[in-house]
């Protein structure tokens, strides 16, 4: 049976591992997580993935962020209950997925040291320098406060009347009072020192990702750490190269009206693609994008539209003679295109003669308003 607990204003259900699963997870954790800090970094990484997911989905469905939620990660240690809670505002699994696939791993005895403030800070500082989301640590702390004796008794009475824990209200505890005789009551009021509980918030990853900072402020060591984190190549990087769309536009020919780009899984894949043959032949340039989000993020720059060379409707600069030759080719191969369309039937929308190829015989393009072929593969995965 699940145990109901309260986290903030929401009710949360906690499901425990079955005995045999608990033994298996204990074996896995002690075998693969020999470095104990990894478990916390795994949770932070998962939270970051959940935030990435809702950010990506909001690009095509802005209503995903209608609630106005800030994309963030909160870390809440509780030394009394020996729990470490991570809360993100992203998209995760359904309740059924959580029950089937997850459990409360952080309660294992070896991980209790990460309830300490310095341990959490050390891990986050070490691993989160390339996360673009704020990570906030919430700690319950105590401080002494001096108030009048009457006010202290009033707050203490209210606390007993409510009979519940309230983190926002001070916990009253006598730690001392002014010594004075009865004759001095009218001259000076008694005061008491109380211990007041409060929640201390601290943003842990104040160092922002290098791509959001001025290039002049970034050291070679930071570039090296970023390269290793991004590529999992623990050798030093060879060089650093900056790319800007401004530079691309400055080198465009006057006849070129659009910025060409291609998306793919790697630089080698897009560089050897049939789609870039004609663009390179015309001495134009193509922007290689190897991150899935790139195709969503960039639509226009400085009044020039960004055009994918893998979609239909690609218009390359042509003079009068080239246009004439293209019309002749279309007329010459019109019957062949009809035959291929009839043969392929519903597998393709149309078959046309293209001016985008040089050495390749054919290519398959996507419609103007659909996903690119690379994005379709990602969504199917």
From Swiss-Prot:
One Pfam family named in its UniProt record: HSP90
Main location: cytoplasm
Sequence ranges of Basic and acidic residues compositional bias: 145-174
Amino acids binding ATP: 46, 88, 107
Gene3D superfamilies reported in the protein's UniProt record: 3.40.50.11260, Heat shock protein 90, C-terminal domain, Histidine kinase-like ATPase, C-terminal domain
Gene Ontology biological process terms in this record: cellular response to heat; protein folding; protein stabilization
Residue list for modification Phosphoserine: 177
Coiled coil stretches, renumbered: 315-347
Transmembrane segments: none
Compartment(s): Cytoplasm
Residue pairs linked by disulfide bridges in the UniProt entry: none
Function (record text): Putative molecular chaperone that may promote the maturation, structural maintenance and proper regulation of specific target proteins.
Subunit and partners: Homodimer.
Similarity section: Belongs to the heat shock protein 90 family.
Name recorded for this polypeptide: Putative heat shock protein HSP 90-beta 2
Species, as recorded: Homo sapiens
């Amino acid at each position: 049976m699940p145990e109901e607990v309260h986290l903030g204003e929401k009710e949360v259900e906690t499901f425990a591992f079955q005995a045999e699963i608990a033994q298996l997870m204990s074996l896995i954790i002690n075998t693969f997580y020999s470095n104990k800090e990894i478990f916390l970094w795994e949770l932070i990484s998962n939270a970051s993935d959940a935030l990435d997911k809702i950010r990506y989905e909001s690009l095509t469905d802005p209503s995903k962020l209608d609630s106005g939620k800030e994309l963030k990660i909160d870390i809440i240690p509780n030394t009394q209950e020996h729990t470490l809670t991570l809360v993100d505002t992203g998209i995760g699994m359904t309740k059924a997925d959580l029950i089937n696939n997850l459990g409360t791993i952080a309660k294992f005895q070896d991980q209790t040291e990460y309830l300490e403030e310095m341990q959490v800070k050390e891990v986050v500082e070490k691993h989160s320098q390339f996360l673009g989301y704020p990570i906030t640590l919430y700690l319950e702390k105590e401080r002494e406060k001096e108030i009048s004796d009457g006010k202290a008794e009033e707050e203490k009475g209210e606390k007993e009347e409510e009979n519940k824990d309230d983190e926002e209200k001070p916990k009253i505890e006598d730690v001392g009072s002014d010594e004075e005789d009865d004759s001095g009551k009218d001259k000076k009021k008694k005061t008491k020192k109380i211990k007041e509980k409060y929640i201390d918030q601290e943003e842990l990853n104040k160092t922002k990702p290098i791509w959001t900072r001025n290039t002049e402020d970034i050291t070679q060591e930071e570039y090296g750490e970023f390269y290793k984190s991004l590529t999992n190549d623990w050798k030093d990087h060879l060089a650093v190269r900056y790319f800007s769309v401004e530079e691309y536009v400055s080198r465009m020919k006057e006849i070129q009206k659009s910025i060409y780009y291609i998306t793919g899984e790697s630089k080698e894949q897009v560089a050897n693609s049939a789609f870039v043959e004609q663009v390179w032949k015309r001495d134009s340039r193509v922007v290689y994008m190897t991150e899935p989000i790139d195709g969503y993020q960039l639509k226009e720059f400085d009044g020039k539209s960004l055009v994918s060379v893998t979609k239909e409707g690609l218009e390359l600069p042509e003079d009068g003679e080239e246009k004439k030759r293209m019309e002749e080719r279309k007329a010459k191969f019109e019957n062949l295109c009809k035959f291929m369309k009839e043969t392929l039937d519903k597998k393709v929308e149309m078959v046309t003669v293209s001016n985008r190829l040089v050495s390749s015989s054919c290519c398959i393009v996507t419609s103007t308003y659909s996903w690119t072929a690379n994005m379709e593969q990602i969504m199917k995965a």
